[in-house]
Amino acid sequence: MSDPEDKPSRLHAGRIDGGSNDDNGLIGAPADFVRGALADRDPLPGTTGFAGFLAEAPIDDGTEPALVRDVLGRQPLFIDRGVEPGGTANDRLPRWSTDPTDLADPKPLPAGAVLTPGATMPWWSLPSPEPAAPSAAQAAVDRALRGVVGDLRASPTDDVAVAFSGGVDSGVVAAALPRAPCYVAGFEGCHDIAAAREAAAAMDRDLRIVEITHDDLRRAIPAVAAATGRRNAMDLNIAIPLFLVAEAAAADGFDRLAVGQGADELFGGYSKVVEPATDHRVEADTVRGARDETVATLPVQLERDVVALRAAGIEPLAPLLDDRLVAAALELPGELLATPAERKVALRCAAAEYVPAGVAAADKKAVQYGTYVSREIDRLARRNGFKRRMDDHVGRYIDSLCRESMMDDHSL
């Protein structure tokens, strides 16, 4: 652990104004590793994501400076739409950063893309393998999870805390980090705190509860909106509990927060993938097709979640988005993804090696509902005169808080 006041820059060498021709500014993987993935066009080369600047990226038959972002967008990268490139290797590219607030007019580099001085090119795409036989598919998930857990257990993790809600995703992450304290956020009496208490007791883990108040919401709403550039209620309902957990862990001196992001998307955790042919929320009519639709939403979600966590002063660690688990998940047949009786079938089976049966089988509410954050933001909106009969009453309340925060900032 380190003093939260002494944290390194979140840019991770991600310059936005220059750098010498032989400099690289990457987060998530070494430059040589990313060059190899570029040369081979390998979308899953064995990382948990990467993004940044390469001075000499192997593009087609030559090398040139480039910005890159991995195939799932696990490391967000933003470019400035409003600044013309310059003339040196780095300056021939747009201004860029891993933090959108560094830029005047940020937009995300698409997941799997390479941006050179001449073009933005889709470089990597996710594999679309045929489903493996059930026994082989389950064995592949078991092996992948065993490798991820083993690597984490063998790594220095004194600076890591775990975001913990008592479900199978955070349970497996916590099991891979046996000495890390677990943090859960929510309003008094909420599902997530109750589930986390039960799971932590079953796993004999140190659980630290971040009890959210209305004052916390009034403070966090403009902070998260400013950090992410998003003011819609759904994004804030999801990001605020993460932000408040991360703040608490950072205040306790932790540098990294391990999260369960990606499990629902990869392994069939959403109700809409169970019977997609009759569910209007997806276009696909098969479980695998519906799962693929949810995987495609990950880059946009991670642009929100990763940025919100970093704004709280902590670096996210998402072991369930490891390439090994991604590759194994993509080969799962529908019956090991979701059925009317159970979702995330293969992941729960693999997790049984690491967590108690009750944790492996636990149902989990979406974070915005399990923490009561969505309910309580709605309550605050109505108390402040934004009634449900109004169009987008919660969105209007959020806008009012953001305007007040900006006025307060300008008066300082």
Model-derived features: positions:
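Charged, low-complexity surface segments at secondary-structure and domain boundaries
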Residues: G18-S20, W124-E130, D279-D285, G313-I314, ...
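Short linear motifs in intrinsically disordered/low-complexity regions
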Residues: R81, P100, E265, K364, ...
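Short, surface-exposed acidic
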Residues: V355-V367
